[in-house]
Amino acid sequence: MNRREIKITAKEAAKQAGKAAKLVTLVFLLIQLGLNGLQLLTNFLTSRTSGGGSISDALAADTRNKAIVYIIMVIVGIVGVLLNIGYTRIALQVHRREPVPMESLLEGFQIPGRAIGLRLLRALLMLMWTYAILIPAIILLSIPITPLDRMTESDTWFVIYLVVLLIVAVAVSTAVSYRYWGATFILLDHPDYTVRECIRAATEMTRGHRMELFLLDLSLLPWNLLCILTAGILYIWKMPYIAAVYAGAYEELDRQYQQKKERARELRQQFPTRQYPPEQM
């Protein structure tokens, strides 16, 4: 994956998209800001609400307030997921030099079941992988550690082992996050795919390219930091470019993945009795 070429293409595509992409980005950011503000306002108002004089009334009011907060959080989360699906469509349109209509932001609301299902399944899988690594580290952390002035050689090796295990846990968690990279793009490009098929395709597509995706994120980190320093205002101009970079990376990985599948089909036709593994979906 040629990061430099992908970025050059994304820069040209974002420039061609022009004001339309910036306007859609502005609306997207304002809606996200409004959703976050709604959640903060709800937390503030419910925290100031008194349940009355008695303890039972206070407990009832506290329970009611927590329920309201949780409901608002769920609604905000769902709307945020669906809007992100819509902006992913915008990213593909910018990269492909297609028109960028405002209606594309609402595309997630046309497939709410698949969009939310994909987010939940991906979160569940990442959580399972993370806990599989973190649980041994948590167990080891619960073991009392001897003070430094009384440490034996075995205690020192135990601490070193613990630090290494924690580093490995962080590394594995990061790698797992790239395992399902691109699943949202696949969801939009393949409306006939189920949520599980999108996850499987993303896993196969990113195999052998996860370090490249990590380096791509690192290369875009300066732009993200600069946008944050401007209170997010710079995102209006740079978010279409950043999104187009990711869309370009997806299309490059997808192209290589489709070529791999095609080669596997050809080999199966030539050697029908031979077991050939590349297409594992």
PLM regions: where:
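Hydrophobic alpha-helical membrane segments
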Residues: M1-M281
